[in-house]
């Protein structure tokens, strides 16, 4: 379970970086060269999703919970926005959903 969760967090980080770099290019007039590491990051994101031993839809559903938590960490660390009680509550609910889905992988 810990290995799966850590893999999901790495996957989410790759997805967020892969989307953030083009955002910088489009919104902040950053270098177009940021699209190259963005593409690599998104390719790594896709590859990491294939490393889970469950059906793709189940992996995507469980991953969504970790993505929510990772995006909120990004919001706090990179964007500098203080998280609200609603952010924390939503993250906890999403993470619990992920844990329930992953716990059932070997039982279905």
Curated annotation (Swiss-Prot):
State the membrane topology: Multi-pass membrane protein
The residues exposed to the Cytoplasmic compartment are 27-30, 82-84
Does this entry carry the keyword Cell inner membrane?
yes
What is the first-listed, main subcellular location in coarse terms? Answer: membrane
- What Pfam families does its record include? UPF0060
Residue spans, topological domain Periplasmic: 1-5, 52-60, 106-108
Location of the protein in the cell: Cell inner membrane
Q: Which InterPro entries match?
A: UPF0060
Q: Which UniProt keywords apply?
A: Cell inner membrane, Cell membrane, Membrane, Transmembrane, Transmembrane helix
Q: Which NCBIfam families match?
A: PRK02237.1
Family recorded in the similarity comment: Belongs to the UPF0060 family.
Q: What is this protein's name? A: UPF0060 membrane protein YnfA
Which organism is the protein's source? Escherichia coli (strain SMS-3-5 / SECEC)
Please spell out the taxonomic lineage of the organism that makes this protein.
Answer: Bacteria, Pseudomonadati, Pseudomonadota, Gammaproteobacteria, Enterobacterales
